[in-house]
């Protein structure tokens, strides 16, 4: 079979045909015909003979490319040489330039595979030459579709924004001159438009791609990428529609977009699903993140594609090889973006970004992220020093500002001084004594290492506020709702920093509360996003707190929860996560509710369905010598049976032992209904400043106990 194919090829290549310079269209078709003829030939001896005896440099160049693919000329130098000769002989013909671009692209691949070649940009220079050759071909013939597609693919891989803008302009000209642009051309045109920043034009290109009958799943994803990056909710529908189509090429693209933030367990589940099940899985994946970050549904998906586009535009990895050293604290393996891009896609825009110039140090940056559980501090350094390193265009994560490339050659005080706005720890490193400074330096390194671990293994879209408010809050599960339990989110906002509006009745404070309860998989079991107006007869002083309460129906169980409080247009706070235990309804056994605690004038009142007034404190802080009102409920008791109540205040850490209570109160009560509602006052007169445990035990006639505990902190007046 190979011999017959080669013989036919010999006839084709040795037949007398006009010179390629005759007409551009005919030379292009002749080029493609020869290219198709040699594609299936693997006899290098006959191909080499044809190459030597061919008097047409373009045809010889096509054969040379095939020889290179078969390993007979691995660096494609023969093909490049023949195509260069063809560009000189047929200067007004586009086909030789197209062939030269193909050969140089092949040579670039060979250079990148050669591990003996040193440097971080191996093969990229040749790839740029390939792109230039394609551009020359388009300069001669703007309708040369194959050259336009090849140029776009090369420039997309180079990640050079300047080259992409030029490629965009050339593609626009080709699109305008080709009446019925093929699907492949529309696809790469849209991708180049998006990569060069013209996202709206890219969306139009993909709409044309879909309207013309291009691959539907791929077209829907590309259209969704554009709309989502622009923050448009209209991108949701094509995203999920495309995910439900079992197109291998499109599904690989979906997976690549997901892989930058998803752990292996999520990717494994994604790989196992098909059709609508895959689309439903993606919807749940993104919606879970919306709920976790207290965002409206769909916002996390749009933010993800905005970040991807921004990272690829601003933090591209314009090297072909990455060499790591001992001070590289993280090895992403990415070939698309540097470590700044990795962090940006996962964590978003930093609250503060420093890019100082320090004499002796390589280019570097530091980012700070505001987080409810503790800020993240991240340092990036490019270049190299005596400890190794990479490239000036490859920013790497390092644990400490003292690990920046060239830090040993830079003034230490200038390195530290340049980061003072990020954290007080840098002032301590600079100004404290020898041992204090060393301890702070060790702490700064630990913070850096922890920040790298958190930021490279998680993703976040936490709410950010221009002005951070001082606030305390608590979620107390007591009472009943249609879902089982009732959670009371009680909050107190420090008046300093709040805004108010005057009314005829006094002043009012607008407050927005966002709250989510999560299971152990961080999936929402209940959410709340509500606004309320708190009225006062006068504006609060700086030492006062704005207090309020909202209700969240909760199913029985132990849940973690996250909450954000916003007051006015720009002030707010995201609170650290906490947990709440919601008692069951008592159908199987007695169930003890949460413990509500409060002092008159320093708590929010709640009126129960039985008409009782309960005081709910927004925090666990109580002043010394306070009289604390305690309220709890026991559901599922037997009417007429006696129950023993024990309320105690204990020292922390020993509440399970036989220690003597610091404060104790016990009593018997006969249940008058299936629900016991108990309200008692506990005096804290004898307790000093510090932390304590308030414990409530309720025993049934058989001696079975229900126990609840709460931590309180006693402070001075």
Where are these regions (language model features)?
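Intrinsically disordered, low-complexity terminal regions enriched in Ser/Thr/Pro/Gly
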Residues: 406-717
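Residue-level recognition of tetratricopeptide repeat
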Residues: 56-58, 93, 144, 181-182, ...
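Residues within mature, well-folded domains
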Residues: 158-159, 195-199, 215-487
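Short coil/linker segments at helix-helix boundaries
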Residues: 65-88, 92, 102-136, 157-169, ...
């Amino acid at each position: 079979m190979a011999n017959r194919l080669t013989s036919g090829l010999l006839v084709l290549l040795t037949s007398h045909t006009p010179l390629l310079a005759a007409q551009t269209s005919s030379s292009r078709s002749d080029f493609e015909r020869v290219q198709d003829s040699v594609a299936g030939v693997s006899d290098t001896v006959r191909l080499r003979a044809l190459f030597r005896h061919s008097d047409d440099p373009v045809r010889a160049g096509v054969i040379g490319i095939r020889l290179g693919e078969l390993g007979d000329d691995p660096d494609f130098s023969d093909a490049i040489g023949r195509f260069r000769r063809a560009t000189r002989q047929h200067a007004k013909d586009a086909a030789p330039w197209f062939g030269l671009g193909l050969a140089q692209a092949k040579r670039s691949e060979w250079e990148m595979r050669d591990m003996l070649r040193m440097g971080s940009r191996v093969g990229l220079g040749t790839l740029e030459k390939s792109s230039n050759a394609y551009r020359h071909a388009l300069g001669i013939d703007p309708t040369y579709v194959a050259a336009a597609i090849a140029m776009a693919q090369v420039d997309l891989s180079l990640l050079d924004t300047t080259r992409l803008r030029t490629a965009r302009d050339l593609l626009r000209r080709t699109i305008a001159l080709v009446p019925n642009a093929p699907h492949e051309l529309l696809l790469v045109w849209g991708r180049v438009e998006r990569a060069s920043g013209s996202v709206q034009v890219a969306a139009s290109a993909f709409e044309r791609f879909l309207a013309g009958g291009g691959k539907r799943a791929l077209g829907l994803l590309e259209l969704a990428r554009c709309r989502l990056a622009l923050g448009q909710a209209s991108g949701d529908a094509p995203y999920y529609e495309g995910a439900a189509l079992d197109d291998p090429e499109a599904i690989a693209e979906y997976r690549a977009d997901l892989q930058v933030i998803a752990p292996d367990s999520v990717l494994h589940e994604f790989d196992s699903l098909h059709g609508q099940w895959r689309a439903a899985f993606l919807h749940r994946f993104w919606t879970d993140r919306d709920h976790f970050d207290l965002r409206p549904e769909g916002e996390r998906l749009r933010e993800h594609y905005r970040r991807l586009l921004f990272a690829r535009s601003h933090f591209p990895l314009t090297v072909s090889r990455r060499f790591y050293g001992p001070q590289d604290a993280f090895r992403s393996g990415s070939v698309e973006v540097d470590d700044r891009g990795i962090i940006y896609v996962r964590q978003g825009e930093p609250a503060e970004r420093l890019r100082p110039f320090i004499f002796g140090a390589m280019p570097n940056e530091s980012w700070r992220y505001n987080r409810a559980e503790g800020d993240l501090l991240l340092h990036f350094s490019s270049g190299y020093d005596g400890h190794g390193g990479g490239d000036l265009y490859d920013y790497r994560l390092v644990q400490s500002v003292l690990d920046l490339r060239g830090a040993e050659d830079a003034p230490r005080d200038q390195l530290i001084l340049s980061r003072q706005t990020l954290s007080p720890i840098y002032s301590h490193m600079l100004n404290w004594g020898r041992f204090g400074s060393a301890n702070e330096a060790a702490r700064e390194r630990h913070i850096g290492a922890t920040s790298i671990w958190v930021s490279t293994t998680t993703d976040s879209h936490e709410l950010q506020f221009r002005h951070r408010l001082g606030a305390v809050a608590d979620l107390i599960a007591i009472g009943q709702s249609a879902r089982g339990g009732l959670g009371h989110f009680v909050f107190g906002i420090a008046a300093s920093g709040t805004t108010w509006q005057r009314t005829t009745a006094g002043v009012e404070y607008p407050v927005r509360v966002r709250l989510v309860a999560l299971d152990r998989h961080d999936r929402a079991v209940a959410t709340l996003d509500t606004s309320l107006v708190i009225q006062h007869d006068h504006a609060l002083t700086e030492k006062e707190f704005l207090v309020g309460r909202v209700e969240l129906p909760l199913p029985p169980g132990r849940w973690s929860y996250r909450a954000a409080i916003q007051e006015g247009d720009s002030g707010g706070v995201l609170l650290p996560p906490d947990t709440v235990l919601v008692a069951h309804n008592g159908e199987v056994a007695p169930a003890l509710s949460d413990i509500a605690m409060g002092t008159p004038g320093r708590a929010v009142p709640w009126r129960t369905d039985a008409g009782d007034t309960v005081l709910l404190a927004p925090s666990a802080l109580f002043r010394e010598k306070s009289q604390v009102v305690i309220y709890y409920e026991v559901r599922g008791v037997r009417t007429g049976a006696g129950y023993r109540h024990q309320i105690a205040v204990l020292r922390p850490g020993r509440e399970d032992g036989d220690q003597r209570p610091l404060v104790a109160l016990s009593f018997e009560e006969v249940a008058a209904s299936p629900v016991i509602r108990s309200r008692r006052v506990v005096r804290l007169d004898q307790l000093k400043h510090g932390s304590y445990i308030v414990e409530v035990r309720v025993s049934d006639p058989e001696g079975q106990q229900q126990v609840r505990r709460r931590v309180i902190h006693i402070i001075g007046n």
